[in-house]
Amino acid sequence: MASRPGALTEWPWSPLGSFKYLLVAPLVMASMHSYVTAVDEEKDLSRLMIVVLMLWRIVHSQIWISVSRQRTAKGTNKIVDKPIEFEQVDRERTWDDQVIFNTLLMYLANIKLPGASHLPPWRLDGAILMALLHAGPVEFLYYWFHRALHHHFLYSRYHSHHHSSIVTEPITSVVHPFAEHIAYTLLFAIPMVTASLCGILSIVSIMGYITYIDFMNNMGHCNFELFPKRLFHLFPPLKFLCYTPSFHSLHHTQFRTNYSLFMPIYDFIYGTTDNLTDSLYERSLEIEEESPDVIHLTHLTTHNSIYQMRLGFPSLSSCPLWSRPPWYLTCFMWPFTLLCSFALTSAIPLRTFVFERNRLRDLTVHSHLLPKFSFHYKSQRHHESINTIIEEAILEADEKGVKVMSLGLMNNREELNGSGEMYVQKYPKLKIRLVDGSSMAATVVINNIPKEATEIVFRGNLTKVASAVVFALCQKGVKVVVLREEEHSKLIKSGVDKNLVLSTSNSYYSPKVWLVGDGIENEEQMKAKEGTLFVPFSHFPPNKLRKDCFYQSTPAMRVPKSAQNIDSCENWLGRRVMSAWKIGGIVHALEGWEEHDCGNTCNVLRLHAIWEAALRHDFQPLPPSPL
């Protein structure tokens, strides 16, 4: 928000939240009904295309969001290398308000404005007139209006809201107070209203003009340079007719230069072109892909997780992954969800790609996505292809000089690759160190269990983490109750020889601390006493069936305050909370440990040292749950 918010700062429908799209629903239904029921001579395709344009604008902007976030995480041609935090994401989450506003006005114009209904598909004279009006009056008026917005009175009340984002994302371009958008809409309406009054407006010219505005806005704020030098060498006047991302980026860092809308000619005419324009452009083109110190390899979970990942919807990725997806994803977007899921996992070459970049002290940490869902990992027939992708990612990272790769979620399954041991045995000369994160996860779980607990129930699949936790607890004198004979036998074989109790009696459901993981059944949860604390040791959280019980987070810690560029949530974890498996790789690199930390067994003797190292680097335990 602006430093001193003026009148008409907030959008009128702000209280509606995500239900704001209901404002256009009656108009959409009415236009569809009239088109279907009207006779051929009275059908108005132009009115029907308004909703198509609205949907296209949202998809178009989302494409820019995803591409920009991936490119800036990768680092190639990046312009401003500063962090984006949750504060900016929250401020920009209403970027689609202007789409709703424009849609409502277009419906009104279609009904009331002469020449704005029953439009032909295409008219060349109308398109030429609109192009000339944009290059002339629109660009000229915008330039001077923009300069006026930088006067202290208007800047402090309105435009400072937009300039709160020093590092821009595509959607930053449309994050303005409501009053500013009224002015911008009047400006951009000049070509369309004039063509309409002249009777030469067409469907293609409207859609093309608005798409041009959105494209240029998004491109100018994408924070990576994409114009090749040869383009300006082939056509030198282009420098005055089309701005570049680096050109507008200077406006956000210098404030008093580069005011033009899309055509820099007005800055050249009035002497407000920044002196660094050419040098920043050339320097941005020379920036190569960044080589990180640590790579964390993860994957998608559910189909709807494509929206919650960092390259998805910013408003969703900045919040923990939901147990129940939002109503609009389930009801309206499932075809798009399936299409995107198919494209990610089948239609494009399968390889990992970077989607997030964090800074922690002197470390650069990249998160890479393996484009597979959780259900792929549970199918034996997908194991070979998944291992091939992981293997290629390890070798590529090793070649680039990456220090550590941590295997997140199901990439470190024992059934898949022996918790990473398979790659170490196959490539014994690897310089990169593989960390499956199990040691860090185990020590986090151990320290999450209340100190006063003397007896706990163990229930879930017996994994490497679970075995290490049970062993350590038994060594500390905590009685661990196991409910299945098979799990009891495996734990005995692994070296647990005291404080381990096997019982199938209902009386042994009474301890108020349960150590749980994948495999716990809903019926078993219901047998726990009121007030029981469930402590997960697995990647995935248990179903929260009991409102009278407490559920801890999956193994995780809060990141140091010095950690930068954290603008999204890691799956179901909260803001600035990181999974233990990812922390394991980071701590391994910070400590400079030379050995791999992966394989079928966990070195229990090192757990305390790993915990102390995490605390030493300012990772903080999550607040304890009551017992």
Curated annotation (Swiss-Prot):
Give the main localization category: membrane
Q: Tell me any Pfam family this protein matches.
A: FA_hydroxylase
Task: Extract one GO molecular function annotation from the record.
Answer: iron ion binding
Q: Does the keyword Phosphoprotein apply?
A: no
TM region(s), chain numbering: 19-39, 48-68, 126-146, 186-206, 328-348
Family statement: Belongs to the sterol desaturase family.
Q: How is this protein named in the record? A: Protein CER1-like 1
Q: Which organism is it from?
A: Arabidopsis thaliana (Mouse-ear cress)
